[in-house]
Each structure stands twice: as C-alpha cells, then as structure tokens.
C-alpha cells in the first residue's frame, strides 16, 4: 500500500502512543485534525487531508467516540525506522 511521507510520520507518532483529535463545526464537518504525540507535542504534518486518507485506508480508527488511534492494519503497513526523530543520514 502506498503511504506518503506525511502519512508515515503521522502513523509513526500514533504507533508510539499518539492520538488524533478532531475539531468539528456546528454541522459536524471536520475543521481541523490535531495529531498529538504521547508527550503532548503537536505534529504539523497531520492535516485534514492526511487524516481522511488514513481513515479511508482503515489505518486509523476511533472507539467509543474517543480519539483516533492506529489499527493493526496501520501497524502492519508501517515502514520500520530506527528512530523517527533522526534522519537516515545521521546514522
């Protein structure tokens, strides 16, 4: 499955314990998607388009109205990295 770099970054943050919280307008439409790491930092790569793409591919899901988290399918499609914070050139 083809996954773009912003989608990969978002999935890595979710795999490490992060979550996606949505903000909706009065009609129920999504205004913004905020990806928060387990440390509480916001990930700037996570946009509404990235969120919708990950949800469409069923790589993320929400349970009981909670924040969106990575699914088993998302973990299976995630490419392994030594450390998400360090580029390949640093090693």
Curated annotation (Swiss-Prot):
Q: InterPro entries, alphabetically? A: YjhX_toxin
Q: Pfam families this protein is in?
A: YjhX_toxin
Its family remark reads: Belongs to the UPF0386 family.
Q: Which protein is depicted?
A: UPF0386 protein CCNA_00226
> Which taxonomic lineage does the organism of this UniProt entry have?
Bacteria, Pseudomonadati, Pseudomonadota, Alphaproteobacteria, Caulobacterales
